[in-house]
Amino acid sequence: MHFLSPAKLNLFLQILGRREDDFHEIVTRYQAIAFGDQLSLSISSRDSLQVINACHLETPSNSIWKSVALFRRYTGITTPVSWRVVKQIPVGAGLAGGSSNAATALFALNQIFKTGLSDEEMRSLAEQLGVDTPFFFSTGAALGVARGEKIIALEESVSDRYVLYFSSEGVLTSRAFAAVQPSDCSSRKNLEYTQNDLEKPVFRLRLDLKEKKHWLENLWAELPVHIGLTGSGATLFVRYPEILEEDLSYAAQIQRAVTLSGGLLTSPIRRDPTAWYSIYSESALAAT
């Protein structure tokens, strides 16, 4: 069985302050995108995991094995399984690669063993696997509140396009939040639905990302786009309405900017509640 394990973007992320448990209260807009890893699952005589493009992730601490352990505890099924992952999502990129793998693995196990777990059950289990893991059991568009793990599904479609810019070095989420200062946080009465409050602390830690954003702002200056950081980084992204591509002049400028910058062009992706994210998305599997 084969499954797309999609990346996600934070279209905005607001930090509302520090909680009593020392975590930060946030509100964020999650969006699944048509780019990600490919997971293959089969029943086997022994447990195994192969990760193409990232063999250093073939460890017992991989998020996939955490899903397997949780599934086994919950269902009592202990049949060995074999995983093959074609890794495209960079580690520490702010794209939730590990969380997406965990969610996709949980869904895949439910499918292959026909255990009939509902989305609600899997979403509840996913809360034990990571803050943004439950999001992937939405339709692909949702608000995340509390620490980001409480999901409010959004039904409206987004007609956007995104250009992704990866970094050779990731950013640890814990390090990014540890660098947050009170002045970085948003007012509950004045939320901006395009900004990421983690940008300032991350840019203090990573001057190269700040400079890269300025370079992108200059490159895309003639186009009506938004440029931001997703999650705690290190991925930057350009966002623009898809309708721009219907204008030949804009389309040519977009193509030129994407080519000159070496970005990866992708789109939103939605999930049917009765299935998983489509593995047949051309842009999602272009690199596999």
UniProtKB/Swiss-Prot annotation:
Pfam families in alphabetical order: GHMP_kinases_N
Disulfide bond positions: none
Pathways per UniProt: Isoprenoid biosynthesis; isopentenyl diphosphate biosynthesis via DXP pathway; isopentenyl diphosphate from 1-deoxy-D-xylulose 5-phosphate: step 3/6
Catalytic activity entry: 4-CDP-2-C-methyl-D-erythritol + ATP = 4-CDP-2-C-methyl-D-erythritol 2-phosphate + ADP + H(+)
Class in the EC hierarchy, top level: transferase
Listed GO MF terms: 4-(cytidine 5'-diphospho)-2-C-methyl-D-erythritol kinase activity; ATP binding
UniProt: ATP binding residues: P90, V91, G92, A93, G94, L95, A96, G97, G98, S99, S100
Entries under SUPFAM superfamilies matching the protein: GHMP Kinase, C-terminal domain, Ribosomal protein S5 domain 2-like
Listed InterPro entries: GHMP_kinase_C_sf, GHMP_kinase_N_dom, IspE, Ribosomal_Su5_D2-typ_SF, Ribsml_uS5_D2-typ_fold_subgr
Active site per UniProt: K8, D132
GO biological-process terms attached to the record: isopentenyl diphosphate biosynthetic process, methylerythritol 4-phosphate pathway; terpenoid biosynthetic process
EC number: 2.7.1.148
Keywords: ATP-binding, Isoprene biosynthesis, Kinase, Nucleotide-binding, Transferase
Family: Belongs to the GHMP kinase family. IspE subfamily.
Functional note: Catalyzes the phosphorylation of the position 2 hydroxy group of 4-diphosphocytidyl-2C-methyl-D-erythritol.
Protein name: 4-diphosphocytidyl-2-C-methyl-D-erythritol kinase
Gene coding for it: ispE
